[in-house]
């Protein structure tokens, strides 16, 4: 006796089961799921894979999304603990990582996250040898270096989310201060995604008018308008959200999806993301930090040679030194 499906549907051609634009998110915590829902709502993928070691949490999050399939334009959502579920991904986003525990140093946390990357990355490489990888796990700059080393990928295919969110916060806060939409406020935060990040005040502008031409003291201690507090708020913004809601998720999820869109759509947009900067701006060590990079279907294809003041370049070098002092003691 024929099944309902056999009576209802007549197949004409065999289905092509290979996805054309598959994205994998590794880690289904708050950040991973914010990335996942942002990607789904933007319709960037024809298949989304979720990977996590916590199978109950993973299944629950996946089912929650699948139950909303009617409202999404992504036809296939898959999940699993094994990395074969991620096979043939165009883009893999790593959000999995350990959280700091009481009494632990940043180096201790970093070493634990290095161990996690050693467990994650080989499975990604084996199943998706041609993918691009975006690292979101903190400390993102050093872990981007770690993933690059473990993966053996060309440097342009291993991208840290870096200061893309810092720069977005920067532009939002400038816009709030000026009463202008942040898309019309142009400015960059470079260097470490963290306390030593560098605001490039010399380039901040609205409609091509640099704020420094209107206020030469902008961003300094002598500035009577206290613009320096804008960068302070950028640095403290994540901690502020963390203290109030226990974690950050939505802004970083949107930021990562913005990077994914530039890569998958080959938009050639410029983003401040983490990449290898050895040999540039006086940096001699094999350090990864954020500089403005062109993102397209090959990953990072170019970077912009930013005109900085001597002070800004000095701060960028100091940021690199901060990262190197942690990175040099790593055991890979």
Curated annotation (Swiss-Prot):
The residues the record assigns to binding substrate are 106, 138, 169, 248
Q: Does the keyword Cytoplasm apply?
A: yes
Q: In which tissues is it expressed?
A: Expressed within the midpiece of sperm tail (at protein level).
At which residues is Blocked amino end (Ser) found?
2
**What EC number(s) has UniProt assigned to this enzyme?**
1.1.1.27
GO cellular component terms attached to this protein's record? cilium; cytoplasm; cytosol; motile cilium
Q: Where is the active site?
A: 193 (proton acceptor)
Q: Which keywords, in A-to-Z order, does the entry hold?
A: Cytoplasm, NAD, Oxidoreductase
Q: Which reaction does it catalyse?
A: (S)-lactate + NAD(+) = pyruvate + NADH + H(+)
Residues holding NAD(+) = 29-57, 99, 138
| Stored PROSITE patterns | L_LDH
State which pathway it belongs to.
Fermentation; pyruvate fermentation to lactate; (S)-lactate from pyruvate: step 1/1
In its keyword annotation, does this UniProt entry include Cell division? no
> What are its GO biological-process terms?
ATP biosynthetic process; flagellated sperm motility; lactate biosynthetic process from pyruvate; lactate metabolic process; pyruvate catabolic process
The record's note on quaternary structure and interaction partners says: Homotetramer. Interacts with RABL2/RABL2A; binds preferentially to GTP-bound RABL2.
Concerning its family, UniProt says: Belongs to the LDH/MDH superfamily. LDH family.
Give the protein's biological function: Possible role in sperm motility.
UniProt-recorded name of the protein: L-lactate dehydrogenase C chain
Q: Which organism is it from?
A: Mus musculus (Mouse)
Query: What is this protein's gene name?
Result: Ldhc
């Amino acid at each position: 006796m024929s099944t309902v499906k056999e009576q209802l549907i007549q197949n004409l051609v065999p289905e092509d089961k290979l996805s054309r634009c598959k994205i994998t998110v590794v880690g289904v915590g708050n950040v991973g799921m914010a990335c996942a829902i942002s990607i789904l709502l933007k319709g960037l993928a024809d298949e989304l894979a979720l990977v996590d070691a916590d199978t109950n949490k993973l299944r629950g999050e996946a089912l929650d999304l699948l139950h909303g399939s009617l409202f999404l334009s992504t036809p296939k959502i898959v999940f699993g603990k094994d990395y074969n579920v991620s096979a043939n991904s165009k883009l893999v986003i790593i959000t999995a990582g350990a959280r700091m525990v009481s009494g632990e140093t940043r180096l201790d946390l970093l070493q634990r996250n290095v161990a996690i990357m050693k467990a994650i990355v080989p499975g990604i490489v084996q199943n998706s040898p041609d993918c691009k990888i975006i690292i979101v796990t903190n400390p993102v700059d050093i872990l981007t270096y770690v993933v690059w080393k473990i993966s053996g990928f060309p440097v342009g295919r291993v991208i840290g989310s870096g200061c893309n969110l810092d720069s977005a916060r920067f532009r939002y806060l400038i816009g709030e201060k000026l009463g202008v939409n942040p898309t019309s406020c142009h400015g960059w935060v470079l260097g470490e995604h963290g306390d030593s990040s560098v605001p490039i005040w010399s380039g901040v502008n609205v409609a091509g008018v640099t704020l420094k031409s209107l206020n030469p003291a902008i961003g300094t201690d002598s500035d009577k308008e206290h613009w320096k507090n804008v960068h302070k708020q950028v640095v403290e913004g994540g901690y502020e959200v963390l203290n109030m809601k226990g974690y950050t998720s939505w802004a970083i999820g949107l930021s990562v999806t913005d990077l994914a869109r530039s890569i998958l759509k080959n938009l050639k947009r410029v983003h401040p993301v983490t990449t290898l900067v050895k040999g540039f701006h006086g940096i001699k060590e094999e350090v990864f930090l954020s500089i403005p990079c062109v993102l397209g279907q090959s990953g990072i294809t170019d970077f912009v040679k930013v005109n900085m003041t001597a002070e800004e370049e000095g701060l960028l070098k100091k940021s690199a030194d901060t990262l190197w002092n942690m990175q040099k003691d790593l055991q890979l």
